[in-house]
Amino acid sequence: MDWSRLPDIVAVGLLASAFASVAGRNLTRVSSIWLTGWLLIVLHFTALMFFPAPGLWGMLAGLIALASLTWAGSLFMWASVPFRNESSSRWMLWLLLASNTLYICALDVGGPPWLLTCAAILLGTGPLMLTLLTLRRFSHRLRWMTVVLYFSLGIFLLSVQRRAGNGPDLALNGVLFTVYLGCCFHFWYKYRRATTGAFITICGFFAWSCVFLVSPLKEAYFPAIRIESEVWNLPKYVVALGMILLLLEEQIEHNKHLALHDVLTGLPNRRLFQDRLTITLERARRTGTKAALLVLDLDRFKQVNDTLGHHVGDLLLQSVARIFNGRIRRSDTVARTGGDEFSVILEGPTNAAEALHVGRSLQELLKEPMELENRTVKTGASFGVAIFPDDADDLEALCIAADQRMYENKRANQVSDEHYPKTKPPASQSAKPKGGGRFSLHL
């Protein structure tokens, strides 16, 4: 047994434990695939401990060590595929796992030349054939990147595997180089945003792939230079560190999202709404433009909750959120600011007529009956509009103005655009809703 591998087993095992601890209860499919990959790396080092054993056990240990290393890389690559749920993506994973394993086994046990040739052809053309067979149903640039990588690998294997001397070593390093360079490309595609964890992971995978390129070059041209195994294994630890940072970054982003969004509807909550409204008003004040605040309150929502249950009420709120999201511009903001209250910030060049048009459009959409839990639910909405700076010149007064007009709207039974205030009250009254709450709209 090679006891020098024990520190690597302990180190990678501890990293895998730390990874599992960070993932914790929020273990996603991606992080579970990553964890499986790191357990395979632990298996890789464990098998290397038994590799010096003579006979069958040593050969099996070598095969397990190589296969687990390629399986881990294939899983890391697949975890970063944005279309994992696509059936052809799963077929591609199994094809790569099978063809890599077949070639490594044929190479390691010294299989006949025809078997090596067939395995190399399968490894090089298998992804291409699968991509062409599923082209009508699905296509993606990452899929074609994989095709190019493995087609190039197939050509390389056919050219070096029969070379005397270091041919088998070059072929083996070529397979591992392709697997981990594919990880680098896939992670770069998925995590292109400039975060520390993404940068470290991508660089780590690139360095990991370069190990299988530099090692044969060193043996060929600088055989006298000795590099310790810890140096070759360093990229593995860099990737592990990067993945742990990625998990932490994603959890921080998730917590930020939960703090600023409504859990039920996914819309911005009151806190984020007020932040965005503050920014909108500052921008409008700086550019001399107007902004509108639209407040909508659902009609008969309490009746839905009382008669059909809170579950149906929740479904109603989610449906309303989807409707509003589908009709509001990207530059605008729709938020859930109360139990059955929604608020909309209308940015850019806007005026009372445009804001009223948006409010009426949303109002009309809610007139349509909704099918929830095989039940037809009818609701409606009352809304109020306030324009900055015509109705108020600060956030609090603008919200009060819109709220008061919405509540007057609920009490009234008619639409009366004529009552919209035409003049701006004196600045001394800016702490109160401007227009005296005379604007009246109702469903």
PLM feature spans:
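Hydrophobic framework residues that shape the active-site pocket
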Residues: 301, 320, 334, 342, ...
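Signal-transducing coiled-coil linker helices
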Residues: 199-201, 207-264, 271-281, 332-333
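Hydrophobic transmembrane alpha-helical segments in integral membrane proteins
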Residues: 1-14
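Juxtamembrane segments at transmembrane-helix boundaries
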Residues: 14-31, 47-221, 226, 242, ...
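Conserved nucleotide-binding and Mg2+-coordinating catalytic segments in signaling enzymes
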Residues: 256-275, 296-310, 318
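A short pre-motif secondary-structure segment
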Residues: 333-336, 377
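Short helix/loop segment flanking the catalytic signature motif in cyclic-nucleotide metabolism enzymes
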Residues: 316, 329, 343-364
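Catalytic-core segments of nucleotide cyclases and related cyclic-nucleotide turnover enzymes
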Residues: 352, 356-363, 367, 371-373, ...
